[in-house]
């Protein structure tokens, strides 16, 4: 779990997301509260439940990007799901319990990686011994068994030194490696993914752990042997329990597009993919026990962050019980021209940096001037105002159109310097931006 302070979390998010300080502060506080709760004594810790968040804002302002970046910072089980993928229990489609199953799978994978990393040093030693056994087979006794020698031979020590220095990396050896389990692919009908995954694991376990000889270069064999030895050092049952604990205490679920499951007007018949999904989400958010293939998971202390554009529906269109379980409301603001300018220049891997790097592979040096950046931002904002407002995503559309000619002719422009200033942008975009009908289809 991340031990970063709220200020550090916001600072890290600022490297990738422009503006939306309120949303950043809310998720930073929520993430820090996970750590604070774990410092309490056990009795009080059980009573402190997470304050779930509802992020409201137009499309393309950074809701999903905040979730993506938060996943990397959290160092905790994290899953992002689309609310529109689910239907009410009993109907064709995914049921909401699969959110917790997927979160548990993600936790098992995360904990396994951490456990393997923790045992890597010991695994490297064991892998080294196995390679040395192939290079210098140990002496055998009268019964054909390898003798345990008290001290490694001088030749073995010499080869160990060469192996560590990388002198033997390109030498080819034949070594026994664990064979891949029998592959059985079962296509799951909607809603039955859990049953099919259990069937798959059953078929994979039928073959047992077989080994087969493979010819590999030593550097490639070393990587595979380290992974194999590290996996042997991990206790699967302990790993599952650690993963379930991580989900229950630190798990975070991000539900995107929650506004799309709001009830719209008076409809007749069951509303299985809207209000039905909201009703099914209630026990998950409130706290219940979900059965997974790794064990039973309690959802009482899992943090839920929901987000939606709410352009057609309103937050009040959610059923009252679900509104009550999302107590913290954060409104994200629509982006302005100055925000667009900052998006083009400030993030670590901004769109302009990406284009410059892509063109540099062809030997073309692209330079964006301040006036060019300003004109691109104005063009994107203008198209958003006159057509549909899709936020920062409009910058991708505008830049792709602007760079189209350079991208197409890049191989013929090797060694050239191209400056993209206000004049260049106006020449390539003004006609499209001014013609509302054209910009509707092209930008």
Curated annotation (Swiss-Prot):
Compartments where located: Cytoplasm
GO cellular component, one term: HslUV protease complex
TM annotation in the entry: none
Superkingdom classification of source: Bacteria
Keyword list, A-Z: ATP-binding, Chaperone, Cytoplasm, Nucleotide-binding, Stress response
Alphabetical list of InterPro entries matching this protein: AAA+_ATPase, ATP-dep_Clp_protease_ClpX, ATPase_AAA_core, Clp_ATPase_C, HslU, P-loop_NTPase
Cell membrane among keywords: no
Main localization category: cytoplasm
Listed Pfam families: AAA, AAA_2
GO biological process: protein unfolding; proteolysis involved in protein catabolic process
Induction, per UniProt: By heat shock.
A GO term for molecular function: peptidase activity
Family: Belongs to the ClpX chaperone family. HslU subfamily.
Complex and partners: A double ring-shaped homohexamer of HslV is capped on each side by a ring-shaped HslU homohexamer. The assembly of the HslU/HslV complex is dependent on binding of ATP.
Annotated PANTHER family: ATP-DEPENDENT CLP PROTEASE ATP-BINDING SUBUNIT CLPX-LIKE, MITOCHONDRIAL-RELATED (PTHR48102), ATP-DEPENDENT PROTEASE ATPASE SUBUNIT HSLU (PTHR48102:SF3)
Function: ATPase subunit of a proteasome-like degradation complex; this subunit has chaperone activity. The binding of ATP and its subsequent hydrolysis by HslU are essential for unfolding of protein substrates subsequently hydrolyzed by HslV. HslU recognizes the N-terminal part of its protein substrates and unfolds these before they are guided to HslV for hydrolysis.
Record's protein name: ATP-dependent protease ATPase subunit HslU
Originating gene: hslU
């Amino acid at each position: 779990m991340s031990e970063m302070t709220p200020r550090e979390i916001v600072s890290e998010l600022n490297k990738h997301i422009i503006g939306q300080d309120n949303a950043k502060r809310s998720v930073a506080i929520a993430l820090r509260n996970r750590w604070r709760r774990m410092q309490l004594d056990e009795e009080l810790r059980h009573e402190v439940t997470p304050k779930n968040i509802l992020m409201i804002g137009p499309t393309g302002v950074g809701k999903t990007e905040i979730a993506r970046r938060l996943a990397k910072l959290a160092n905790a089980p994290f899953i992002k799901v689309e609310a529109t993928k689910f239907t009410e229990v009993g109907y064709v489609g995914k049921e909401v319990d699969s959110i917790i199953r997927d979160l548990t799978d993600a936790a098992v994978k995360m904990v396994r990686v951490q456990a393997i990393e923790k045992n890597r040093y010991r695994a490297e030693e064991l892998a080294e011994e196995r390679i040395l056994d192939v290079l210098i087979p140990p002496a055998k006794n009268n019964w054909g068994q390898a003798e345990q020698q008290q001290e490694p031979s001088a030749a073995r020590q010499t080869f160990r030194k060469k192996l560590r220095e990388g002198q033997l990396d390109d030498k080819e050896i034949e070594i026994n490696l664990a064979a891949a389990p029998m592959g059985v692919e079962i296509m799951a009908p909607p809603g039955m993914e859990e049953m099919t995954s259990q069937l798959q694991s059953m078929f994979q376990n039928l073959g047992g752990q077989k080994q087969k000889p493979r010819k590999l270069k030593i550097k490639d064999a070393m990587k595979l042997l380290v992974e194999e030895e590290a996996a042997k050092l991990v206790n699967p049952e302990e790993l599952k329990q650690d993963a379930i604990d991580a989900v229950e205490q630190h798990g975070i679920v991000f539900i995107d597009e929650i506004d799309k499951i709001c009830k719209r007007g008076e409809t007749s018949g069951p509303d299985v993919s809207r209000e039905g999904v909201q009703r099914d989400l209630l026990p998950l958010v409130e706290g219940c026990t979900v059965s997974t293939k790794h064990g039973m998971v309690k959802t009482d202390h899992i943090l839920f962050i929901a987000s939606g554009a709410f352009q057609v529906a309103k937050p009040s269109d959610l059923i009252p019980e679900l509104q009550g379980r999302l107590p913290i409301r954060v409104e994200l603001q629509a982006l302005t021209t100055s925000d667009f300018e900052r998006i083009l220049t400030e993030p670590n891997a901004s769109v302009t940096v990406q284009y410059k790097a892509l063109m540099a592979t062809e030997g073309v040096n692209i330079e964006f001037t301040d006036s060019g950046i300003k004109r691109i931002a104005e063009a994107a904002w203008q198209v958003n105002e006159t057509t549909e407002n899709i936020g920062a995503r409009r910058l991708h559309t505008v830049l792709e159109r602007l760079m189209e000619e350079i991208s197409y002719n890049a191989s013929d422009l090797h060694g050239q310097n191209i400056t993209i200033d206000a004049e260049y942008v106006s020449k390539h975009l003004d006609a499209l931006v001014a013609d509302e009908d054209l910009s509707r289809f092209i930008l």
